């Protein structure tokens, strides 16, 4: 049975356009509360990022949950992985995040965590969707859920992040720039690194509700590159709006993406006998990551795109480490979801172990040129499965003769087809990607 509202990462869209409306979110809170309460009395944590619409949606979700008889604990602006962690530590039945992650302020969305801090199973999302079709009711007054605020959430999460590196770890002597994307990490990320001894300069940590991800953060890293060079810093760290992604910049201003960060963490864990099993990437992971891990004898498998699928593969194999080129990195031995701050700490620890700067340490992996072109489409078309598109992909694959790969997939959150071509010749890769994108666009017309 297919889902009507839930995509690969919850429900997301433009504020004011269905289903990202106050009336739908009220009903969603109620339906979720009904689903969570099937085991009896329940508590639900609710957190958000810094976009202005979060306050509106927090209020209606709170009302819907309470109407269903669920107690609500409000965390305020907090990173998505913090909500996953706090859901576990408060022994809540579920956690809810109000965020559109790396999207602009005019978008918003909702995603859920189970009581174990993992993404909700598909079956429970389907139950919530079924309940949305029912008329909304309110429990008796004596059974209404209570609502309260947690005032020490940031401090709890800071200590949790610091606990992901061994006691006594110090990054004294490290000069870094931290870009918080005017998002959910603005209160916590700089303090985590400072409390571990680093000298920290901070960018984009003055959220006003409208500037989240605006020319800052992991999706627009130009300002961080300039600041790292101006400050003569050792490196820069950029988070996205909700703190589940991280990218870095080395001292030369070069960007270090999620695949390279995953390699650095995996190599360090492997060299210190800490890596359990192998590494999970995605269909979009750079071929260079796979080959670098292969050279070290580290198994590598690809999951579907999306950190929930990376996590599912890790759990199925009882492995610890996985991630995506976008900077979603999951360290199962520390967290139950992608956590930008914790991933950054593991990279810093790896650099400390090797006594190298980021620019040197990244040389252990050779990235293959990879070109990604997004093609927007409308309606219920399936351009990926179109015979003309399939034939074109097969033709390009044959031309690359084992020196690269082609991947077309539909986005789980937007009406986009992502055309990815990867190979050892950058000019040919770009030519193939542009040609395939035009074919997809023509089919969609």
Swiss-Prot record:
Mg(2+) binds at residues 101, 240, 242, 244. The modification Phosphoserine is found at residue 101. It catalyses: alpha-D-glucosamine 1-phosphate = D-glucosamine 6-phosphate. SUPFAM superfamilies: Phosphoglucomutase, C-terminal domain, Phosphoglucomutase, first 3 domains. Keywords: Isomerase, Magnesium, Metal-binding, Phosphoprotein. Activated by phosphorylation. One of its GO terms (cellular component) is cytosol. GO terms for molecular function: magnesium ion binding; phosphoglucosamine mutase activity; phosphomannomutase activity. It comes from the Bacteria. Binds 1 Mg(2+) ion per subunit. The active site is at 101 (phosphoserine intermediate). GO terms for biological process: carbohydrate metabolic process; peptidoglycan biosynthetic process; UDP-N-acetylglucosamine biosynthetic process. Its EC number is 5.4.2.10. Its cofactor is Mg(2+). HAMAP family: GlmM_B. Belongs to the phosphohexose mutase family. Catalyzes the conversion of glucosamine-6-phosphate to glucosamine-1-phosphate. This is Phosphoglucosamine mutase. It comes from Azotobacter vinelandii (strain DJ / ATCC BAA-1303). The gene is glmM.
């Amino acid at each position: 049975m297919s889902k009507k509202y839930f995509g690969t990462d919850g429900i997301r869209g433009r504020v004011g356009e269905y289903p990202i409306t106050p009336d739908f979110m009220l009903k969603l809170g109620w339906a979720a509360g009904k689903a969570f309460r099937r085991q009896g009395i329940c508590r639900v944590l609710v957190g958000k990022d810094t976009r202005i619409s979060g306050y509106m949606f927090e209020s209606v979700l709170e009302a819907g949950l309470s109407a269903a008889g669920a107690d609500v604990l409000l965390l305020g602006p907090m990173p998505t992985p913090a909500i996953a962690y706090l859901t576990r530590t408060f022994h809540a039945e579920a956690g809810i995040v109000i965020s559109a992650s790396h999207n602009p302020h005019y978008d918003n969305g909702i995603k859920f965590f189970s009581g174990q801090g993992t993404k909700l199973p598909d079956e429970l999302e389907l139950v919530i969707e079924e309940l949305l079709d029912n008329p909304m009711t309110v429990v008796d007054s004596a059974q209404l859920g209570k609502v309260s605020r947690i005032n020490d959430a940031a401090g709890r999460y800071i200590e949790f992040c610091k606990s992901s590196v061994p006691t006594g770890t110090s990054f004294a002597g490290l000069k870094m720039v931290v870009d918080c994307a005017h998002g959910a990490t603005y209160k916590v990320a700089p303090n985590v690194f400072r409390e571990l001894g680093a000298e920290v300069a901070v960018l984009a940590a003055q959220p006003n509700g409208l500037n989240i991800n605006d020319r800052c953060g992991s999706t627009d890293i130009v300002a961080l590159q300039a600041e790292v060079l101006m400050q003569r810093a050792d490196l820069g760290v950029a988070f996205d709006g909700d703190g589940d992604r991280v990218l870095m910049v080395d001292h030369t201003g070069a960007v270090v993406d999620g695949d390279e960060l995953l390699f650095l963490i995996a190599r360090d864990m492997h060299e210190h006998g800490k890596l359990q099993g192998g590494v999970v990437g995605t269909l979009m992971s750079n071929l260079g990551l796979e080959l670098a891990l292969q050279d070290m004898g580290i198994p590598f498998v690809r999951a579907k795109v999306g950190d929930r699928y990376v996590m599912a593969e890790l759990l199925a194999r009882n492995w610890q480490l996985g991630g995506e080129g976008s900077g979603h990195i999951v360290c199962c031995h520390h967290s139950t979801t992608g956590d930008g701050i914790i991933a950054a700490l593991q990279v810093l620890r790896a650099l400390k172990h090797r006594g190298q700067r980021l620019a040197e340490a990244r040389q252990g992996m050779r990235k293959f040129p990879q070109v990604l072109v997004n093609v927007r489409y409308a309606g219920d078309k399936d351009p990926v499965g179109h015979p003309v598109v399939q034939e074109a992909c097969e033709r390009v694959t044959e031309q690359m003769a084992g020196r690269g790969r082609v991947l077309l997939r539909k986005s789980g959150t937007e009406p986009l087809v992502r055309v990815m071509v990867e190979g050892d010749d950058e000019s040919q890769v770009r030519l193939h990607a542009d040609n395939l994108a035009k074919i997809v666009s023509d089919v969609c017309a």
